[in-house]
Amino acid sequence: MLILGFDTTSSLGGAALYRDLEPLDEVRADGSTNYSVQLFEMTDRLLARAGLKLAEVDLFAVATGPGSFTGIRVGLAAAQGWARALGRPVRGVSVLEAMVADARPPGSIAVPLLNAHRGEFYLGVFRSSPQDAAGATPGPVWTPSTEGLALGPVRIEALARELADEAGAEVAFIVREHDEAARDLRDHIPEAAQWITVPGFHAGAVARVAFEAAREGRVHRPDELDAYYIRRSDAELNWQE
C-alpha cells in the first residue's frame, strides 16, 4: 500500500511517502505555515523524486490537529480533495497520536503534551495493548483512553501524580524538542515517570499510524474527515477572523 502522509499543523510539518511501513522519502516544510502553496510543492517534489504519480497513492493520511487552525484546514482540504478526485480512502491522525508513534514508549501509559498557549497544554492519555495476533503491527498498539484535553500546569501535575501512582515507571510523558513551554513541565512530573523528547516532524508517523488503521479497515471517506482542535471555541473564533 502506498501512503502519502502529511502534517500541516505547525511550521515543522512536511510530507512523507511510505510503502506499507517502509519509508520511501520525506520532505520538510521551509519553516513557514504557508501550506496553501507549500503543501502542493512538497507533494510534487516528493512524488517526482520517487518516480511516482499522485494517482498511484492508495491512502491519504493527514494530521488533524491540534495545532495551527489555518494549517489544519489546508491539510484537511487537500486530503479530502485528493481522496475524492481519485476515489481513495483517507485517514486522519491526531498530532498526539503521531507523537506516541514517534516516541515508541516502553511502558503501558503514554501522555503526549503540546503547548496550547494561554497557559494551557494539549494532552491525551494513551494506553497500550499487546501486538495484534497477526503480528502486523510492530510493538504494542496504542489507543486513547480519554478525549483530548487542554489543561494548565496544576491540573497536569495532579493527573501526572494520579497516573504515576497507578503505573509508576510505566508512564511516559512525551514532548517535542522545540516546545520549550512543554519541556518546562518536567518539574511538575513525578520522578518515577519517564520523560521522552521527540522531533516536531510527524509526517512519517502520520503515514505509519494511518497504514496500521487501514489494515483494520479504520479509514474515512473524504466527507467523514474532521479536524481535531480540542479547544473548539478557539477554532471558531479563528475561523471568523
State each model region's role.
Residues 46-50, 85, 103, 206-214:
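Stable alpha-helical structural segments in soluble proteins, enriched in small hydrophobic residues
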Residues 48, 52, 190, 212-219, ...:
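Generic secondary-structure signature for well-ordered alpha-helical cores
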